[in-house]
């Protein structure tokens, strides 16, 4: 295992979680690859591209009682062959006004190391509750 890559990805994930909590679009953008793909957990909607994902977050952040999402990595597997890694973990969405749990589940994310650091290329979510 590449401990430095594991730590770098965990730090990027923490920064992404912080950006979601603070509704900080400027901090979300650099964590996403230009052609990032997100598959949602309930209806499997596909959000393709950084611009589309930032637009989706912008709309989400406008809601008066929005959902704050947190992803918690359980395991990160770093490839020895390519500058890529796979993150597995649990996610949860809580109400921004009451902190009640709205939904939760599992996710996987594919990361790529670039000149700007580790970026998310793809995420897929499974809603369990």
Residue spans for each PLM region:
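A short, structured loop/turn motif at beta-sheet edges
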Residues: 77-84, 111-117
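Generic short beta-strand segments
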Residues: 35, 88-94, 126
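Beta-strand elements of well-folded, non-transmembrane domains
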Residues: 93-97, 111-113
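Short beta-strand edge/turn micro-motifs at domain boundaries
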Residues: 104-129
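A short hydrophobic beta-strand element
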Residues: 82-91, 105
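A solvent-exposed, acidic/Ser-Thr-rich amphipathic alpha-helical stretch
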Residues: 4-7, 25-83, 102
């Amino acid at each position: 295992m590449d401990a430095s890559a594991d730590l770098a990805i965990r730090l990027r994930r923490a920064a992404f979680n912080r950006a979601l909590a603070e509704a900080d679009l400027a901090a979300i953008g650099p964590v996403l690859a230009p052609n990032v793909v997100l598959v949602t957990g309930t209806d499997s909607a596909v959000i393709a591209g950084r611009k589309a994902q930032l637009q989706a977050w912008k709309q989400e952040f406008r809601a008066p009682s929005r959902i704050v999402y947190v992803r918690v990595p359980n395991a990160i597997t770093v490839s020895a062959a390519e500058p890529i890694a796979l993150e597995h973990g649990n996610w949860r969405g809580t109400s921004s006004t009451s902190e009640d749990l709205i939904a939760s589940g599992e996710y996987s994310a594919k990361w790529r190391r670039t000149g700007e650091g580790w970026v998310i290329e793809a995420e897929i979510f499974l809603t369990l509750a």
